[in-house]
């Protein structure tokens, strides 16, 4: 990998590539004091967050799907092989031998709601309680939120927007539209997988 990027001189400074299920060591006494884990606790190669979510969701075959609603909206599935595609899916080796994970996602999930909270409810510690109450009420479903404040993999210059916003709309309508827009984006990613 270092040769591919033209930085062969750092090859001896990188950690070895291991499988996620390989035991690579144990928690030392000093590490246990620093992090609170018991000395001797095994340490494995591990996963990054989205793959860990898929594993903990029980995803182990192509007809199952993991949906992560974090900062990003991400759908993950598992296949027996990497499938060529013009679309830039993210592929990787899964923890089950002979399996690969495939991700489809974009920054169109909770990052949008967090932006709204920071802009319009910065001092309201109970804003999420209000939101839950508001979305349970009837709201104007013709107000559409495009959750692309932080980008999209649909197009490089696709902006976020509130489409159909009018003077009669309230913050309740806007919150409901944001929630619907986030769910819409999740469905787009799931459909692509």
Q: Residues of each region from the PLM?
A:
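Active-site core segments that coordinate phosphate-bearing ligands/cofactors
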Residues: 1-8, 22-193
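Short beta-strand-loop/turn "lid" adjacent to the catalytic site in phosphate-handling enzymes
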Residues: 11-21
